[in-house]
Amino acid sequence: MLGKLINKFFLSRNERILKNLNDLVIKINILEKDLLKLSDKELKKKTNEFKLRLKYGDSLDSLLPEAFSVIREASKRIFGMRHFDVQILGGIILHKQCIAEMRTGEGKTLTATLPAYLNALTGKGVHIVTMNDYLAQRDANKNRILFEFLGLTVGINVSGMSRLDKKNAYLADITYGTNHEYGFDYLRDNMVFNSEKKVQRKLYFALIDEVDSILIDEARTPLVISGPIENSNILYDRINSLVSDLIPQNKKYDNSFNEIGDFCIDYKQRQVNLTEMGLKKIEKLLVKYKFISKEESLYLSKNIFFIHHILLALKAHYLFLKNVDYIIKDDQIIIVDEHTGRIMSSRRWSDGLHQAIEAKENVFIQNDNQTLATMTLQNYFRLYKKLSGMTGTASTEAFEFNSIYNLDTVIIPTNKPMIRNDLPDLVFVSKSDKMNAIISDIKNCVFRQQPVLVGTVSIEKSEKISRLLNKLNIKHNVLNAKFHSQEADIIAKAGEPNAVTIATNMAGRGTDIVLGGILKKENNEKFFTTKNSVKLLNIWKKKNRLVIKSGGLHIIGTERHESRRIDNQLRGRSGRQGDPGSSRFYLSLEDTLMKFFASENVIKIIKTLGLKSNQSIEHPWLNSAIERAQKKVENCNFDIRKQLLEYDNVINEQRSVIYNERNKLINKLDIHDHILFILKDRINFCIKQYISGNSMNVDSFFALEKELKNNFYFIKSINKFLEHDTTLYENVDKLIDLIVTTIQFSYNKNTAIVSKKYSNMIEKSVMLQILDIFWIEHLNAVDFLKQSIHLRGYAQQDPQQEYKRESFFMFQSMLEAIKNNVIKSLINIFFVDFKKNKNIYINFIDQKDYDSFHFLIMKSINIT
């Protein structure tokens, strides 16, 4: 009942929003008549006119009707495609920083040109975000001619580009790229030593295609730039051998540590927890195999990391499956994207998990990595001044979009009514019965020449269906998604008569399945005037009619995904633009969703029906029960993403402080006064260790002098200061000022050996490198803290509050350590190293060999 009320409220709210925008759509349509009279040259001039009006005070909102009319008219002239009214609505919604839910085939790519053109008029840059490099290049190349016709520039930002090419791409009015590339560029920009090496401008407007995949599905995996660290990988092998000695609890989801067993597996959270019994056994095993001595405890600070390694090994064995989560190729573990089924050859799991899986599979164990920079996608996209997105499936995640990103979701009506027939789910007792029914459905589709798209949840299951079809000599395509361009071609042919296409549920998004197949043409005019093209067109029309007669594209879901939205995405491949189509999901009690998340009552009732071999059950009640199971998983995944964001918000505040400091250092020509300020702060801190109240005793003089000499090359005698001015005994502040002035004078004298240009570059390089060294150490220390902080829960402490508190103290300690080491290193360079290496520093700067210069600085830095 509550769900129906929420839906009713949401729909009525949606209708109100669309109704309020209707007048704006009418206004845009009226303006269309005036633009028909303009020549191409006159239409192009509109862009400069809009820019001038913005400059003199007009707002983007006031320009919207005219700007949308102009790009619609340009699209008609360039592509022969006129934006539908529903696409105009979508464009307005995107400009107003909302999520536009537009069904598959409704022309999201063309819709995006509307807000992209309008916001590009500001000159601040529009970033259109896609799921992969292929889609970024395809959409950029397709729309480039349209935007360039109107005087705007288009850039492409994909992996493998040079820094200069990336910089030029970001300088364009409209840039197409992938979410990861935008995020990694931001992190890389905050690791450079020179502002000229930055590629991004200030982040203004991001328009995200398939926004649910990028902001929801991929939000659980943070962006991480890592570098190798030297370490021994033997430990992973040795710990891996202990796993067989550990026994899982019988109730795999029960976290009450009363069950017999060494560890329990939480499949919902994808976590492994050790029981008290397990911890005792592990301690005995570590002693037995001589990891630790008999006298030592597992809980000693130097041994606690063994628990982390054992948990990694258990995760590798029980939660990460071959040909589902990863494949083995060329003696390497290659990650399979859980959402798309794509091979992620350039990525590795962090925190030692990848090494644990390598040990499990007995392949070469590569070195551990340390985190150099990290950020969640949530926090990256929240840096943009304006953010919006579009997808075919957003309404189920409307709450998350609003609570995390402050984005409202608006459902855009379809241009033509949806007539797809979504058939009820069929539930079988066993997987084999279900598979027989799926194969039978495919055979029937082939018999009536109906194209069928079979959606699976993993590569392994795709290959299993493929093997069964091969035995029956049924021609089919398997979408392995290794190459995005090949993926698009296979999807494009999936609408042809008799076509059988097997794909992971999310693969091929971004390419429409056209009934009869896609008819390729260079351009409309040339295509329809050639004799051969007319012949091809007639062939396509015949195929199109045949497919429509057979029932349109049929979708088969081989099991329910843990998210309703992913199921809707699969269904949404059929029934585009009012086309006929159908969909059916096949389930079994052995499916992951049913086994782990469906209620025991549902499974019990189905079993009591006494279904025979190859018999199935279908009922609206059953569909509701499955939906409830999916909602459970969705809520669980939302909690995981929310928790990830809450933890990252803590580090995000610290990251902002560090990145702001870096930017100030990079952009400032002279940081000498800043260094003198830090020097004064460190001297004051040092002196106050030896001062009690407002006076100091003579015994402290010698200890203080020694400390000042060691840290600041202070060669004066405090006694002589006191002999010269006896009031200093009682006026400690005056004495401190005298010591500070003396040391600062000495520092200035030594830096003046070279010109300001050289000394400033040295100061800047030291400051930046030490900042980076300690920030990297801090990131890894905080990550280690995060991995173990949940244990505080057993001591009746709030892990999240404890994490905030401890990470704050760690951050404060890091800032103090940075200041200490900056001063120590600069004094070492200017007071000691300059005596022998001064000319080397100067030569590197003069020759603009900055890599060698920074390396020389690094060698002179002595971290304590």
From Swiss-Prot:
InterPro entries: Helicase_ATP-bd (IPR014001), P-loop_NTPase (IPR027417), SecA (IPR000185), SecA_CS (IPR020937), SecA_DEAD (IPR011115), SecA_motor_DEAD (IPR014018), SecA_preprotein_X-link_dom (IPR011130), SecA_SF2_C (IPR044722). One of its GO terms (cellular component) is cell envelope Sec protein transport complex. SUPFAM superfamilies: Helical scaffold and wing domains of SecA (SSF81886), P-loop containing nucleoside triphosphate hydrolases (SSF52540), Pre-protein crosslinking domain of SecA (SSF81767). Induction: Repressed under conditions of excess protein secretion capacity and derepressed when protein secretion becomes limiting. This is regulated by SecM. It is a peripheral membrane protein. It catalyses: ATP + H2O + cellular proteinSide 1 = ADP + phosphate + cellular proteinSide 2. PROSITE patterns: SECA, SECA_MOTOR_DEAD. It is an enzyme of class 7 (translocase). One of its GO terms (biological process) is protein transport by the Sec complex. Pfam families: P-loop_SecA, SecA_DEAD, SecA_PP_bind, SecA_SW. Keywords: ATP-binding, Cell inner membrane, Cell membrane, Cytoplasm, Membrane, Nucleotide-binding, Protein transport, Translocase, Translocation, Transport. It comes from the Bacteria. ATP binds at Q87, G105, E106, G107, K108, T109, D512. One of its GO terms (molecular function) is protein-exporting ATPase activity. It is found in: Cell inner membrane; Cytoplasm. CDD domains: DEXDc_SecA, SF2_C_secA. Its EC number is 7.4.2.8. Monomer and homodimer. Part of the essential Sec protein translocation apparatus which comprises SecA, SecYEG and auxiliary proteins SecDF-YajC and YidC. Part of the Sec protein translocase complex. Interacts with the SecYEG preprotein conducting channel. Has a central role in coupling the hydrolysis of ATP to the transfer of proteins into and across the cell membrane, serving as an ATP-driven molecular motor driving the stepwise translocation of polypeptide chains across the membrane. NCBIfam families: PRK12904.1, secA. Belongs to the SecA family. This is Protein translocase subunit SecA. It comes from Buchnera aphidicola subsp. Cinara cedri (strain Cc).
